[in-house]
Amino acid sequence: MIIGIGSDLCDIRRITRSLERFGDRFTHRVFTEGERARSDRRAARAPSYARRFAAKEACAKALGTGMAQGVFWRDMEVVNLPSGRPTLRLTGGAAAQLAAITPAGHRALVHVTLTDDPPLAQAFVVIEALPE
């Protein structure tokens, strides 16, 4: 059963401005070390950061909290499965909220899709509860 859905659009130009203006202060506040390493390896850093930013916003919406109630930016990390497919690793307040919305006798599975078509990046997150 689906227990959460979230989507977000992010303007890549806004992320570009944040990278230029705030640099590491911005990236260290919002992104995990793994996300920074992956995005910083790319020639076009801003679209990579924008996709991840959109995924975090979409995940916070799917959790039903937004960026509140103990859910922080770095509690949600975009990682890739061995197949290359993206997913989200939740820790801290995000993991606690996921546990709170997951029905007893079920386990949560987080699906994410990312795309960009400049000047926009987009993410959709679906949280599914599967019987154990």
UniProtKB/Swiss-Prot annotation:
Task: Quickly give the catalysed reaction.
Answer: apo-[ACP] + CoA = holo-[ACP] + adenosine 3',5'-bisphosphate + H(+)
Instruction: Report any one BP term from Gene Ontology.
Output: fatty acid biosynthetic process
Keyword list, A-Z: Cytoplasm, Fatty acid biosynthesis, Fatty acid metabolism, Lipid biosynthesis, Lipid metabolism, Magnesium, Metal-binding, Transferase
Q: Where in the cell is it found?
A: Cytoplasm
Coarse class of the protein's main subcellular location: cytoplasm
This chain's function reads: Transfers the 4'-phosphopantetheine moiety from coenzyme A to a Ser of acyl-carrier-protein.
This one is known as: Holo-[acyl-carrier-protein] synthase
Which lineage ranks, top first, belong to the organism behind this chain? Answer: Bacteria, Pseudomonadati, Pseudomonadota, Alphaproteobacteria, Hyphomicrobiales
